[in-house]
Structure formats: structure tokens, C-alpha cells
Swiss-Prot record:
Signal peptide: none annotated. It is found in: Cytoplasm. It comes from Leptospira biflexa serovar Patoc (strain Patoc 1 / ATCC 23582 / Paris). This is Translational regulator CsrA. A translational regulator that binds mRNA to regulate translation initiation and/or mRNA stability. Usually binds in the 5'-UTR at or near the Shine-Dalgarno sequence preventing ribosome-binding, thus repressing translation. Its main target seems to be the major flagellin gene, while its function is anatagonized by FliW. The keyword Methyltransferase does not apply.
Amino acid sequence: MLVLARRSNQSIMIGDDIEIVIVDIKGDQVKIGVKAPKNVSVHRAEVYKEIQEENKKAAGTNIKPEDLGKLGDLFKKKT
């Protein structure tokens, strides 16, 4: 792991198009901003882990393709 020291309003570049900015420092809390292209997902680690867990659960379900078609039909009827 690369460890860098930064002060408020200083930044770190990752590649050519991702910038991490130190927005504010108060006590033991650091606020950071992330400037990245829209196609790059940015999540807090705990949120990312939850997303991964939910994706694993969803991948393990046994939904039949014909059931998905029926679900789509229900949505069409309501509009």
C-alpha cells in the first residue's frame, strides 16, 4: 500500500483521470472528494462489500427466463 501525506485542498492523482482531493480535516475525520469519469464507480468500502454480497445472493437465485418475461408483462400492463 502506498501511503501519502496530504493537507487540506491538496490532491492525489490516480492515472490520468482520477483525482482524490482532501476537502476538509477535523479531528480524526477526513473528508475527501473524488473526481472521476462517470464510467468509474466510486463507493465507500462498506457499501461496496454490501453490493458484492447482494450480487452474490442474486446470482444464486433460480429465476427462470419465462418468469422474467411474465414479470415484464406485468409492468407493461400497469403503464
